[in-house]
């Protein structure tokens, strides 16, 4: 704008300021949104009164922008009743300058729209075979595990090479970690040298299946790690000289089962329903009876109130496996699953 010579200086300055204000206002009249929904509308309002350049400067793939300068009531109606804002303009139409974050890459999908997909860098992986993850699942290789971590499990790591095992035989744990078998009969690599903090209350005490009182869940985990096999949780609180299950109080929907072999009780979950599966293998239990499955054995234990454990797989009168039982007991503990408070 050029001021005419005959115009007063004050009026010219006022017009200049007004023009500048209108330019700034028009540049900030849009609304910035965090995503464009499948219906084509903008959703999740990020900030109002932003220009498209400001809104799209983050590099996020899903960020979108609308140019309408509307009041709060209209924005509210769009978000609550209309499924988002109309005339939604995505910031990114191609993969150029898209930041997908670590382990992901931008690729154009079948609809010719940019999308972030999991693409971990597997070039430095030397072990090409299967690996066992911290979730207890076997992955065909470490690259497959990295993809699973990218998609839904950010804490997922490789705990050891090879398929997940039921015993510590042939399990080589990395670093200073040690293999331990938990009560679900799965081998895990754990670190035994962690320092357990002193418990702030005696209410943290736990009674182990070995009849020993542990100061906290951490102390029980450490003892389990050093032993190399599961000790297991009998019940919460200090161990008592119980004469029967009537002396033991179980919480969390658990039921006391009495172990006549050692004269102690333990609290076990008894709400598991056994699936109708023909693939389950029969087991020989500690009462020398054969059950259709380990789950059926647990049901019988919960019904009778007497603890049952697996002696060996198969029928009780099918084979005599005294030596095999001794080998199994070195690595496995077929008692009930450990409390979630004791998970590694």
Curated annotation (Swiss-Prot):
Pfam families reported for this sequence: FOLN (PF09289), FST_N (PF21333), Kazal_2 (PF07648)
Sequence ranges of Acidic residues compositional bias: 321-333
UniProt keyword Signal present: yes
Signal peptide: 1-29
Record keyword Zinc present: no
Alphabetized GO MF terms: activin binding; activin receptor antagonist activity; heparan sulfate proteoglycan binding
Domain Kazal-like stretches: 112-166, 186-241, 264-318
Ranges for region Disordered: 315-344
SMART domains documented for this protein: FOLN, KAZAL
A single GO cellular-component term on record: extracellular region
GO BP annotations listed: ameloblast differentiation; BMP signaling pathway; cell differentiation; cellular response to growth factor stimulus; female gonad development; gamete generation; hair follicle morphogenesis; hematopoietic progenitor cell differentiation
Keywords of this entry: Disulfide bond, Glycoprotein, Nucleus, Repeat, Secreted, Signal
Annotated TB domain residues: 30-103
Residues with glycosylation annotation: 124, 288
Domain Follistatin-like: 94-117, 167-190, 244-268
Compartments (UniProt record): Secreted; Nucleus, Nucleolus
Transmembrane segments: none
Disulfide bonds: 32-55, 42-88, 56-91, 95-106, 100-116, 118-150, 122-143, 132-164, 168-179, 173-189, 192-225, 196-218, 207-239, 245-256, 250-267, 270-302, 274-295, 284-316
SUPFAM superfamilies xref list: Kazal-type serine protease inhibitors, TB module/8-cys domain
The protein's assembly and partners: Interacts with GDF11. Interacts with activin A/INHBA. Interacts with myostatin/MSTN.
Role noted for this protein: Multifunctional regulatory protein whose primary function is to antagonize members of the transforming growth factor beta (TGF-beta) superfamily including activin, myostatin, GDF11 or bone morphogenetic proteins (BMPs). Mechanistically, binds to these ligands in the extracellular space, blocking their type II receptor-binding site to inhibit downstream signaling. Plays an essential role in muscle fiber formation and growth both by preventing the repressive effects of myostatin and through SMAD3/AKT/mTOR signaling independently of myostatin.
PANTHER family per UniProt: FOLLISTATIN, ISOFORM A-RELATED, FOLLISTATIN-RELATED
Protein name as annotated: Follistatin
């Amino acid at each position: 704008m050029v001021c005419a010579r005959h115009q007063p200086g004050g009026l010219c300055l006022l017009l200049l300021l007004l023009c500048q204000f209108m330019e700034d206002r028009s540049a900030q009249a849009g609304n910035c949104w965090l995503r464009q929904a499948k219906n084509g509308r903008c959703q999740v309002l990020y900030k109002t009164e932003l220009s498209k350049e400001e809104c799209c400067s983050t590099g996020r793939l899903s960020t979108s922008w609308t140019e309408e300068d509307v009041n709060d009531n209209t924005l509210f109606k769009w978000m609550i009743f209309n499924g988002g804002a109309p005339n939604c303009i995505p910031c990114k139409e191609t993969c150029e300058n898209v930041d997908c974050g670590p382990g992901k890459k931008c690729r154009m999908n079948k609809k010719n729209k940019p999308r972030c997909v999991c693409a971990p860098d597997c070039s430095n992986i030397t072990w090409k075979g299967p690996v066992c993850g911290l979730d207890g699942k076997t992955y065909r290789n470490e690259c497959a595990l990295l993809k699973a971590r990218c998609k839904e499990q950010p804490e997922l790591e490789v705990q050891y090479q090879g398929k997940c095992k039921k015993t510590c035989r042939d399990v080589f744990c990395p670093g200073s970690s040690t293999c331990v078998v938990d009560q679900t009969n799965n081998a895990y690599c754990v670190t035994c040298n962690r320092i357990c903090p002193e418990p702030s209350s005696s209410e943290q005490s736990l009674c182990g299946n070995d009849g020993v009182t542990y100061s906290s869940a951490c102390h029980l985990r450490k003892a389990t790690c050093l032993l190399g096999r599961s000790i297991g949780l009998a019940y919460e609180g200090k161990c008592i000289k119980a004469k029967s299950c009537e002396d033991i109080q179980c919480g969390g929907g658990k039921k006391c089962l009495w172990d006549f072999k050692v004269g102690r009780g333990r609290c076990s979950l008894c709400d598991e329903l056994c699936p109708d599966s023909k693939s389950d293998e029969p087991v020989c239990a500690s009462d020398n009876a054969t059950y259709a499955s380990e789950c059926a054995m647990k049901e019988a234990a919960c019904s009778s109130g007497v603890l049952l454990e697996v002696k060996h797989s198969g029928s009780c009168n099918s084979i005599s496996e005294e030596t095999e039982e001794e080998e199994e007991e070195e690595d496995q503990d077929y008692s009930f699953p450990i409390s979630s408070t004791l998970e590694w």
